[in-house]
Design a protein with these regions (language model features):
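Extended redox/cofactor-interaction regions of prokaryotic respiratory oxidoreductases
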Residues: 2-7, 177-261, 285-286, 348, ...
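Long, well-ordered, tryptophan-enriched scaffold segments
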Residues: 266-367
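N-terminal export/assembly segments and adjacent metallocofactor-ligating motifs
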Residues: 2-300, 471, 759-799
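Glycine-rich phosphate/diphosphate-binding loops that line cofactor/substrate pockets in enzymes
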Residues: 143-162, 219-228, 338, 358-371, ...
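Phosphate/diphosphate-binding loops
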Residues: 497-498, 543-562
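Active-site phosphate/pyrophosphate-binding segments
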Residues: 324-443
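Short beta-alpha connecting loops at secondary-structure transitions
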Residues: 273-279, 537-547
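Long, contiguous, secondary-structure-rich segments that constitute the structural scaffold
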Residues: 554-603, 690-691, 695-706, 710-799
């Protein structure tokens, strides 16, 4: 055994860490691994560790996996091994870069990187797709297989048969394998592109119909004077999105009141909320409608703001060519449908008491400034576009748009965000594109992918997807909704002829590859990390250690493929991975002269760059000077009523964003057979499905089904019982967590668990996507992962 391997294995003794990891939120401040000195006292290899301490270097870096925090990770490296992970000390915290301390995910990366189950060699499939049977091959054979199949299949079907899938595990860096794969394909004829973000695509598509742009969020430092924050389906305490928690905790200490609207009593409710308001999933618009009714009927709306800046509030402010009784006031008062949108009406739909609705509406309207901040979970329903726009109407009625301390709601992306340049991308000769939600259809039968279904740039697709690259992405057979339908297409080798996957582990999706390649971790490659949401800094993610076994970065093997296709000089431009990062940094520096970015050599010393952004309020100029800064809508105003949506003439896309019962929502006839609504949440121990394979993090939060005591009692379910969750699409079996932290009528599981089917197709991993729907949303052509009806039963083993 090599000295380096011996040292690495000594760092992971077979002891339980459950007692440490159960500390929950305290993990943010605890070290997760023993120090080198502590290990030296327990292991023989620790002697070598102690003697090498003088040669140890501590490098500031960040993960470029699928996490938006980009926290400060301090990697302790000695003799080519990461021996410890710490984080930025309190004494080094900067007011402009607050809470750069690594969370539980960041502190556990060492186990993830050095886990013995990581893929080690390139392999090709020898069994049926999905069986997980592979044999080891050389890199020469692997890159030849890719080059030969690209040439053969492209010659037969054309370049539009090639598809690079959603690759979440690498999306946190500016230089990733999926980006460079697209570059390679564009140099050889192009590929079928996709649009839509599974994370927030519905709200990003809907918000511009109110404001003309999706960038409706303020920088968080403008919220210091906010008196009331309503977090609507927003759970930053667990998702850890940049600096959000830091600012919210400061506001809490300074007296800001927090209300959380969520079916689940999340950690955000526990840590921030003065009040928790649970409501049935997919009924958000009914609650919003009733709030608007109270605000208007009690004369609490901001009349001057509405008169000056909006279109569609009442009949007098409607656009031309629209019949009577289509305005917001007419809808709320029931002038057209005969139903007044009272809190009593909404209570029957949402299960929120009428008096709670009244008080919530009054509090929001009477408190200035106030911020209604919607998370991205509610917009992942098939009614999510309406929910996103509904929040913008509430912000508009109360005049909380374009002011410091307010929030325009909707998508919430900050309009002054800055990004690194990224690698240059040649033009894609293939002009058609599909929604990411159409990929199964495009692989199964391209004729079904019509403009109505989301096809752009062409009247039809000329080919099914025949070549698919899944590079560090676990979407194919895990994160994809209606998983069994997707797997059925993947298993049919007459459909997709060649699937290439690269990953760190044998994920459920990797099992369906024809060629499986061992990927490098962020510690074994060069990159630049950038935060999501706040986007206040860039941080260098430097290669710290050499890859073990035969692991290679995507870019490394892509250069070999490019050489075999005769395009290596155009593809690489003669640059190594590190040289690409230097080039990207220089391009970023030139594109932002006002930022005065350091040279790359200086960056290697400083490690990060803090943007010099000033406090930013979305639509501040539009409100201050509407004459010279009209809203970028057709009317130049905030469009409460959207004539563009009205002209689509689709009842599922109302011109006024209001409540329409959701497919598979609580009012659907299917609820008689499947009476419980299932939702998922993003947990603190992984980002989507990334790091699921880390055993330390599995102990942080065991995969269970949350069920309310009332629903459990009706089904004879007790704490810890094995239960089966089922609907018309699949069956999932996990232990029950009987808790009042979930409202009656709703059950919940953490998202991102790996699919683990048995011989009968029953999932034992807790992957909710065996139950979720692939129905696309009507406007964005996006995902509706969260809209699920299920039934739950105690499982009695026959043994």
């Amino acid at each position: 055994m090599s000295e380096r391997k011996e040292k690495r294995e000594a760092l992971f003794p077979e002891i339980t860490r459950r007692g440490l990891l159960k500390a929950g939120s305290a993990l943010v401040t605890l070290p997760f691994v023993m120090s080198g000195k502590a290990m030296a006292a327990k292991t023989a290899a620790g002697t070598a560790q102690a003697s090498a301490e003088s040669a140890e270097r501590v490098v500031q870096t960040c993960s470029t996996f699928d996490c938006g925090g980009k926290c400060d990770i301090r990697a302790h490296v000695a003799d080519g091994v990461v021996t410890q992970i710490t984080t930025r000390p309190d004494s080094a915290l900067d007011p402009q870069m607050p809470v750069m301390r690594a969370c539980v995910r960041g502190r556990s990366y060492r186990k993830f990187v050095y886990h013995p189950d990581r893929l080690k060699y390139p392999m090709k499939r020898v069994g049926k797709r999905g069986e997980g049977k592979f044999e080891r091959i050389s890199w020469e054979e692997a890159t030849t297989l890719i080059a030969d199949n690209l040439q053969r299949i492209t010659a037969k079907y054309g370049p539009a048969c090639r598809f690079v899938h959603n690759n979440t595990a690498t999306s946190g860096g500016t230089f990733s394998g999926d980006k460079m794969m697209r570059r390679l394909l564009n140099l050889t004829g192009g590929y079928l592109e996709y649009y839509h973000s599974v994370s927030m695509g519905n709200t990003a598509a809907a918000t511009p119909y109110t404001y003309g742009t999706a960038a409706s969020g303020n920088s968080l430092d403008t919220l210091a004077d906010t008196k009331l924050v309503i977090l609507w389906g927003h759970n930053p305490t667990e998702t850890i999105f940049g600096h959000t928690n830091h600012y919210f905790q400061q506001m809490k200490q300074n007296g800001t009141r927090f209300i959380v609207v969520d079916p689940r009593y999340s950690d955000t409710v526990a840590s921030l909320a003065d009040e928790w308001i649970p409501l049935l999933p997919a009924t958000d618009n009914a609650l919003m409608d009733a709030m608007m009714y109270v605000i208007v009927s009690e004369n609490l709306h901001d009349k001057a703001f509405i008169e000056r800046y909006t279109l569609g509030f009442d009949e007098a402010s409607m656009p031309e060519g629209v019949p009577a009784n289509e305005s917001l006031v007419a809808y709320l008062m029931g002038d057209k449908d005969g139903q007044v949108k009272t809190p009593e009406w909404a209570e029957k739909i949402t299960r929120v008491p009428a008096q709670t609705i009244r008080q919530l509406a009054r509090d929001y309207a009477n408190t200035k400034p106030a911020a209604l901040i919607q998370g991205w979970g509610p917009q992942r329903h098939n009614c999510g576009e309406r929910t996103a726009r509904g929040s913008t109407l509430l912000a508009t009625l109360t005049g909380n748009v374009g002011i410091k301390g307010g929030w325009a709601a909707g998508y919430g992306g900050c309009g002054n965000r800055k990004f690194a340049a990224g690698p240059e991308m040649p033009d894609n000769p293939v002009k058609e594109s599909i929604s990411i939600m159409n990929w199964v259809q495009a692989a199964d039968d391209a004729s079904k992918v019509t403009a109505e279904a989301g096809l752009k740039g062409a009247d039809k697709l000329n080919s099914n997807i025949r070549i698919l690259f899944s590079l560090a992405g676990n979407y194919l057979a895990n994160q994809n909704p209606d998983l069994h339908q997707a797997v059925k297409v993947l298993e049919d080798e007459s459909k997709i002829e060649f699937i290439v996957a690269s990953d760190l582990y044998m994920t459920p999706s990797a099992r369906y590859a024809d060629l499986l390649l061992p990927e490098t971790s962020f510690m074994e490659r060069w990159n630049i990390g950038e935060t999501w949401g706040t986007a206040s800094y860039l941080i260098l993610s430097e290669k710290l250690i050499e890859p073990e076994f035969e692991r290679r970065s995507d870019y490394d093997w892509q250069r070999e493929v490019a050489a075999k296709l005769g395009i290596e000089p155009q593809f690489s431009e003669g640059r190594t991975e590190q040289e690409w990062i230097e080039h990207i940094w220089e391009q970023t520096r030139l594109s932002m002269p006002d930022e005065q970015l350091s040279t790359f050599a200086e960056l290697r010393e400083k490690r990060q760059h803090l943007f010099k952004s000033k406090p930013y309020v979305a639509f501040e100029d539009n409100i201050r000077d509407p004459q010279n800064h009209p809203f970028p809508t057709p009317s130049g105003k905030i469009e409460i009523f959207s004539k563009r949506l009205y002209d689509m003439n689709n009842p599922e896309i109302p011109a006024l964003s209001h409540y329409v019962p959701a497919h598979e929502g609580p009012e659907d006839a299917l609820a008689k057979q499947f009476p419980l609504q299932l939702i998922t949440w993003k947990g603190k121990n992984r980002a989507n499905s990334t790091q699921y394979a880390n055993p330390w993090l599995q102990e942080v939060q065991v995969q269970k089904l949350w069920i309310n005591p009332m629903d459990a009692q009706q089904r004879g379910i007790r704490q810890g019982d094995s239960v089966r969750i089922h609907n018309q699409r699949g069956v999932c079996q996990v232990p029950a967590e009987v808790t009042q932290r979930i409202m009656p009528g709703v059950v919940a599981m953490q998202a991102g668990a790996w699919w683990q089917p048995d011989a009968d197709g029953v999932d034992h991993g807790g992957c909710a996507n065996v139950l979720s729907s692939a129905r696309i949303t009507p406007l964005a052509k996006g995902n509706s992962h969260q809209t699920m009806l299920v039934e739950v039963a105690k499982y009695e083993s026959a043994v």
